[in-house]
Amino acid sequence: VTMALINNSVKRSSFEFVDKAVNDIALKSGDAGFVCDILLVSPDAGAYKKVFEYGEKLNLSVMGAMKHRDKDGKITLMFTHDVEGKDCLIVDDLCDGGYTFELLGKALKEHKARKVYLYVSHGLFSKGFEKLYEIIDHIYCTNSIKDISGYEFTTTVGVINTNDYVTQYKVI
């Protein structure tokens, strides 16, 4: 059974989900019909290549946040773009506790970003949503780990149903 599942699995790019998030942000900001001034934000060096690729496909600017964790675990964030008045979409593959996104969202707002959104492919949200809710304007996430559609600052548009992409198997 395991080999059949592996052989018949489908690799999905998160690009289509990020594209849905960008379109939803454009609709919410009243910029439907053309892409608004959204800045894609990579939260760390590990995600930058993928986020840059998405930026090229969507014709959007990309900013890489540089995250440094010192020996005591304190995180310092630096970024190079002017974010004043921009809608910023942080893009990453996984959110566990959300501390990095909390810090990055706070830094973006301190630098006068208009709105801060978060897209993650897989959301554990092990520390809950309370801190993120204070900073992040909207979260987009698949339901690959957890269904977040019932929360106030998420919508069914922002929750991508991975069940649509899973093939049903009958074990004989």
Per-segment meaning from a language model:
Residues 1-172:
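PRPP-associated nucleotide enzymes
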